[in-house]
Amino acid sequence: MLRSFLLIVATVSLFGQCKPLPLATSPVSDAVRAPHRSTHETRFLRTNDEERGATMTLAGVLRDKAQTKQLLTSWLNSGKSVPSVSNKLGLKRMSLEQAIHHENWKALTTFQRMKSKKAKAYAKYGTGYQTEAKTKENLLQWVMRGDSPKEVSSTLGLLGLSRRKIIDHQNYEAFRTFLKYRKQWAEMQGNGFTKLTT
């Protein structure tokens, strides 16, 4: 064992003292190592005012990213279908090949993603629509952190609404689940289940 260790130490120290061998000096390798010189200082892939998000043209008017998002969200909240939005964007009667190259294609695909996300949504709060699994995970965190029903109803957008509006609200089931979890947590604590034993 000691011999192996000494052999490794000797090998490492030998390699540490060696100088690196120079690369072959062929015209090709010199060209590869030579710094690139060009008349341009930098290469810009986009201009500063170029649009980066989904934009669309509606009724002959070009909409910027913010306007596009606002319109798509409005259509989503009013329950518009993908075919009706496709028709509004002028893509309905086109072949798939034509539609893909149309200026409103990105807006339509964005709307489809928004629609799909909303369909899978259990509640809407925070950054937007949340899945059932994510919502229940957050509800458990809030219960264990000791958040009050008032705090959670505020987070879910239910605070200050009438009873009728709360019952009709899309986050009502999430709030009921929070109350159920809270009750179960209190029962567990009352039974000493959550106390650590050493």
From Swiss-Prot:
- The organism's taxonomic lineage, starting at the top: Eukaryota, Sar, Stramenopiles, Oomycota, Peronosporales
- Name used for this protein in its record: Secreted RxLR effector protein PITG_22926
Q: Does the keyword Signal apply?
A: yes
Quote the subunit structure annotation.
Interacts with host MAP3Kbeta2 in the nucleoplasm.
* Domain of life the protein comes from: Eukaryota
Q: Into which family does the record put it?
A: Belongs to the RxLR effector family.
Keywords, A to Z, come to:
Host nucleus, Secreted, Signal, Virulence
Q: Which GO terms describe its cellular component?
A: extracellular region; host cell nucleolus
Domain-level remarks: The RxLR-dEER motif acts to carry the protein into the host cell cytoplasm through binding to cell surface phosphatidylinositol-3-phosphate.
Where does this protein reside within or beyond the cell?
Secreted; Host nucleus; Host nucleus, Host nucleolus
Q: What induces it?
A: Expression is up-regulated during the early plant infection stages.
Q: What start and end residues bound the annotated signal peptide? A: 1-20
Task: List the source organism.
Answer: Phytophthora infestans (strain T30-4)
Tell me where the sequence motif RxLR-dEER sits in this chain: 43-52
Main role? Answer: Secreted effector that promotes P.infestans colonization of plant host. Specifically suppresses Avr4/Cf4- and AvrPto/Pto-triggered cell death. Targets the potato MAP3Kbeta2 kinase, a positive regulator of cell death associated with plant immunity, and perturbs signaling pathways triggered by MAP3Kbeta2.
